[in-house]
C-alpha cells in the first residue's frame, strides 16, 4: 500500500465489552428492590432497554417486576420528591389583593 493511501486509514480502536447489568445469578423478582431500583429513573419511570443495555427477555421481566411492585405498593407510581422540595422553597401569599381607588 502506498504511503498516500495509508494516511486515510483510521487506527483500529480496541472494543471493550461492557459487563451486563444483570448477572446470571440475579433473580428478576418484584421483591428484589435493589435490582429493580437500578432500572428506574429519578422520576419513577422505567428506563428503556437501550439505556439499560438489557436483552429483550430481561427487559420484559424487569418491566413486569416493576409493575408488580407498584401494584403491591413496594414502589411508588411517581416519584414526586423534587416537586415537594420546590413547593417548600417557594413562598406563597395567601392574602387578598386590595384595589387602589
Curated annotation (Swiss-Prot):
GO (cellular component) term, any one: mitochondrial small ribosomal subunit
Major localization listed first in the record, in broad terms: plastid
Keyword rRNA-binding: yes
Sorted UniProt keywords: Chloroplast, Plastid, Ribonucleoprotein, Ribosomal protein, RNA-binding, rRNA-binding
Superkingdom of origin: Eukaryota
Disulphide bond pairs: none
Signal peptide start and end residues: none
The keyword Plastid appears for this protein: yes
Gene3D superfamilies for this protein: Ribosomal protein S18 (4.10.640.10)
HAMAP family membership: Ribosomal_bS18
Protein name: Small ribosomal subunit protein bS18c
Organism: Populus trichocarpa (Western balsam poplar)
Amino acid at each position: 500500500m502506498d504511503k498516500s493511501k495509508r494516511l486515510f486509514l483510521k487506527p483500529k480502536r480496541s472494543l471493550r465489552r461492557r459487563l451486563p447489568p444483570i448477572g446470571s445469578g440475579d433473580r428478576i423478582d418484584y421483591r428484589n428492590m435493589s435490582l429493580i431500583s437500578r432500572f428506574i429513573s429519578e422520576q419513577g419511570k422505567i428506563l428503556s432497554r437501550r439505556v439499560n443495555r438489557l436483552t429483550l427477555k430481561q427487559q420484559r421481566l424487569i418491566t413486569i417486576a416493576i409493575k408488580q411492585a407498584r401494584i403491591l405498593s413496594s414502589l411508588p407510581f411517581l416519584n414526586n420528591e423534587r416537586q415537594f422540595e420546590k413547593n417548600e422553597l417557594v413562598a406563597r401569599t395567601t392574602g387578598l389583593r386590595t384595589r387602589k381607588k
